[in-house]
């Protein structure tokens, strides 16, 4: 695979007004994508966005570029990333474009593409778009220019799709649910899905103004959700991130239920129903208690690198249907082609209703081990992880943990940092071991 000049692991992302998140680059990117995709078949591309104010600027620039290349754009308005994956498939569009920086602050944004199948673009198509970006821009004849249209029923279509994943014989009647939409793309969808399934819904983080996405709310900051759940005596709280591909839950006692626990609940329910194909994919950061809990059920578990892209790649490699991260990316491939916060929350809620159990009771099967993370800065040059002393102390700590914990030493890909993570049932022991390793890393 050729080295990427513009595309990262999740499309193009950065600070608005700074290359590559500028109107002129978005125009050129739309044109380059249009030139490549025009040779593929259909001549319409879906464009969705989250609620950042810069989305207006970027969608207009992308549409102009696509039109110049002869492709039409169909706008969905604010829409979760997984909704664009779904709608691209059902509209039989040539591709889907999402304008979002996920859980980042409002002043960041990004542009990523879905294929006609609602999956990541094939490498050869991405490489062709990159090559086209370095070509001079041209314009098709006037009669061949693309058009722009708006999909007025996109929200309703996705709401019905989400509801369709919830068992028809079950209802959320008598459940009080607090929904935190992070002032993001789920604000007009998630609360309505829950209401239409019978729940009493209290909304927070559902008044986007273009500048407040992910600000002290959503999956990356659940304090407000925890307080609201306790205040209104709700059964459960749901927190999504800005583009709706992450889910963190809160039980009726105000406790956080993270992606690892959500993943286990869904896996156990799929096993009971006979729907679990193969095993579960987690990441290097997945809590050891998840691995042990799955093992008790006889469910295979493997770890991918951190990042939902790598989880998905491992799932496809193994032919498995379920994977996720402790940060709340949950991928259920027999329901959608990418991580989907609303779909994941409905899977957990259906387990609660089916067995008449609280979220606290369901999550108690995975009592998370304390994780201690220490970042150690080094002076560049040799990688401390290659030193004999670091390898020796790592081996010593592994032996001390005796299979009841684990260590993870990683070199940052962006800074001169070594990340030291120790995890075990005994939090004090984890802290002690992490500091022991960090001291040796600093000395080397």
Curated annotation (Swiss-Prot):
Phosphoserine modified-residue sites: 102
One GO BP: UDP-N-acetylglucosamine biosynthetic process
GO cellular component: a single term: cytosol
Keyword Isomerase: yes
Signal peptide: none
SUPFAM superfamilies, per database record: Phosphoglucomutase, C-terminal domain, Phosphoglucomutase, first 3 domains
Post-translational modification: Activated by phosphorylation.
Protein's UniProt keywords contain Zinc-finger: no
Residues the entry annotates as binding Mg(2+): 102, 241, 243, 245
UniProt-recorded Gene Ontology molecular function terms: magnesium ion binding; phosphoglucosamine mutase activity; phosphomannomutase activity
InterPro entries: A-D-PHexomutase_a/b/a-I (IPR005844), A-D-PHexomutase_a/b/a-I/II/III (IPR016055), A-D-PHexomutase_a/b/a-II (IPR005845), A-D-PHexomutase_a/b/a-III (IPR005846), A-D-PHexomutase_C (IPR005843), A-D-PHexomutase_C_sf (IPR036900), A-D-PHexomutase_CS (IPR016066), Alpha-D-phosphohexomutase_SF (IPR005841)
Keywords from the named record: Isomerase, Magnesium, Metal-binding, Phosphoprotein
Names of required cofactors: Mg(2+)
Record's cofactor remark: Binds 1 Mg(2+) ion per subunit.
Active site: 102 (phosphoserine intermediate)
Catalyzed reactions per annotation: alpha-D-glucosamine 1-phosphate = D-glucosamine 6-phosphate
Enzyme Commission number(s) of this protein: 5.4.2.10
Similarity comment: family membership: Belongs to the phosphohexose mutase family.
Summary of the function given for this chain in its UniProt record: Catalyzes the conversion of glucosamine-6-phosphate to glucosamine-1-phosphate.
NCBIfam families per record: glmM (TIGR01455), PRK10887.1 (NF008139)
Protein name in UniProt: Phosphoglucosamine mutase
Species per Swiss-Prot/TrEMBL record: Pasteurella multocida (strain Pm70)
Lineage: Bacteria, Pseudomonadati, Pseudomonadota, Gammaproteobacteria, Pasteurellales
């Amino acid at each position: 695979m050729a080295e990427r000049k513009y595309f990262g692991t999740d499309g193009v992302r950065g600070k608005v007004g700074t290359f590559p998140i500028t109107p002129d680059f978005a125009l050129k990117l739309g044109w380059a994508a249009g030139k490549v995709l025009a040779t593929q078949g259909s001549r319409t591309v879906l464009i969705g966005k989250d609620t950042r104010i810069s989305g207006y600027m970027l969608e207009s620039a992308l549409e102009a570029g696509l039109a110049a290349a002869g492709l039409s754009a169909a706008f969905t308005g604010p829409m979760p990333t997984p909704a664009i994956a779904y709608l691209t498939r059902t509209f039989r569009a040539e591709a889907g474009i999402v304008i979002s920086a996920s859980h980042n602050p409002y002043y960041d944004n990004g542009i990523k593409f879905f294929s006609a199948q609602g999956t990541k673009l094939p490498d050869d198509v991405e490489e062709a778009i990159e090559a086209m970006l370095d070509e001079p821009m041209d314009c098709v004849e006037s009669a061949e220019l693309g058009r722009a249209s708006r999909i007025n029923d996109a929200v309703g279509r996705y709401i019905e799709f989400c509801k369709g994943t919830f068992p028809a014989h079950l209802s959320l009647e008598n459940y009080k649910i607090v929904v935190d939409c992070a002032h993001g793309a789920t604000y007009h969808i998630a609360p309505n899905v829950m209401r239409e399934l019978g729940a009493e819904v209290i909304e927070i983080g559902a008044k986007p103004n273009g500048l407040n996405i992910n600000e002290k709310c959503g999956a990356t900051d659940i304090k407000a959700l925890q307080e609201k759940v306790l205040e209104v005596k709700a059964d459960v709280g749901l927190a999504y991130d800005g583009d709706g591909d992450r889910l963190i839950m809160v039980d009726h006692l105000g406790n956080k239920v993270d992606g690892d626990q959500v993943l286990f609940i869904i896996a156990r329910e799929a096993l009971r129903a006979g729907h679990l194909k193969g095993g579960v994919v987690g990441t290097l950061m997945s809590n050891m208690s998840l691995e042990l809990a799955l093992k008790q059920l006889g469910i295979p578990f493997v770890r991918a690198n951190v990042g939902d892209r790598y989880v998905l790649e491992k799932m496809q490699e193994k032919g498995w249907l379920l994977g996720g991260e402790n940060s709340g990316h949950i991928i259920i491939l027999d329901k959608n082609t990418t991580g989907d916060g609303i779909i994941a929350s409905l899977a957990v809620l259906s387990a609660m209703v089916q067995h008449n159990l609280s979220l606290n009771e369901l999550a108690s099967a995975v009592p998370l081990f304390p994780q201690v993370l220490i970042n150690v800065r080094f002076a560049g040059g040799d990688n401390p992880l290659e030193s004999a002393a670091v390898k020796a102390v790592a081996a010593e700590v592994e032996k001390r943990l005796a299979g009841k914990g684990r260590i993870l030493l990683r070199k940052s890909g962006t800074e001169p940092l070594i990340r030291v993570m120790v995890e075990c049932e005994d939090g004090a022991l984890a802290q002690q071991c992490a500091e022991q390793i960090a001291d040796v890393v600093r000395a080397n």
